[in-house]
């Protein structure tokens, strides 16, 4: 794995990595990780893909892994569309290095939503896409959730973590694991 940085569209430095196979590569796979994750969690998967001839590239979204700035976790400086543009920036960087190879993107969980926005914005940018661990919510619940988030953002600040929003979003995820020591045990 080779690590490097790109300038984020929303400001800051975007931590990236590329895994290259020992054999002749047959395609590029870009990974878009989920919420409360980082690219290091995908190292084994990237090496598995390498063993099958794939170049793998990924970035830590702003506020995640090696792209956390000033201790502010989970915050996309520039917002959602900036995170989508960061994925495009990584795509362009890697596609320029491997112009003859097919280009695939896999988005998992929150990464699947970023990928869905990406595909809507750039429908011809990739050859194949894998949308993993995605979801759908009732539009009324989504509107209510957005309202709660806006109110909490006004109360605690744009870059602060709201305990209420965290509990509403993830509170039930750990229930099936029994006694856990990590609020993110559900990610396993």
Language-model regions: role of each:
Residues 1-23:
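N-terminal cap/lid segment of alpha/beta-hydrolase-fold proteins
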Residues 34-37:
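Active-site glycine-rich loops that stabilize anionic/oxyanionic intermediates
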Residues 41, 46-71:
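Conserved alpha/beta-hydrolase
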Residues 77-95:
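Alpha/beta-hydrolase active-site loop
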Residues 98-109:
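Alpha/beta-hydrolase fold nucleophile elbow
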Residues 107-117:
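Glycine-rich nucleophile elbow surrounding the catalytic serine of serine-hydrolase chemistry
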Residues 116-188:
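Alpha/beta-hydrolase-fold enzymes
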């Amino acid at each position: 794995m080779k690590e490097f940085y790109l300038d984020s569209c929303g400001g800051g430095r975007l931590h990236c990595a590329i895994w290259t196979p020992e054999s002749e590569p047959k395609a590029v796979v870009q990974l878009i990780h989920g919420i409360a994750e980082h690219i290091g969690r995908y190292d084994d998967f990237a090496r598995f893909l390498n063993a099958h001839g794939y170049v793998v590239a990924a970035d830590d979204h702003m506020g995640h892994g090696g792209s956390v700035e000033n201790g502010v976790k989970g915050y996309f400086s520039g917002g959602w569309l900036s995170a989508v543009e960061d994925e495009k920036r990584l795509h362009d960087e890697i596609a320029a290095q491997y112009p003859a190879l097919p280009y695939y993107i896999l988005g998992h969980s929150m990464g699947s939503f970023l990928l869905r926005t990406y595909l809507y914005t750039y429908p011809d940018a990739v050859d194949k896409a894998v949308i993993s661990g995605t979801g759908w919510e009732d539009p009324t619940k989504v509107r209510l959730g957005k309202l709660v988030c806006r109110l909490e953002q006004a109360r605690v600040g744009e870059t602060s973590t709201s305990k209420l929003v965290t509990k509403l979003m993830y509170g039930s995820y750990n229930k099936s694991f029994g006694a856990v020591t990590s609020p993110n045990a559900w990610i396993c």
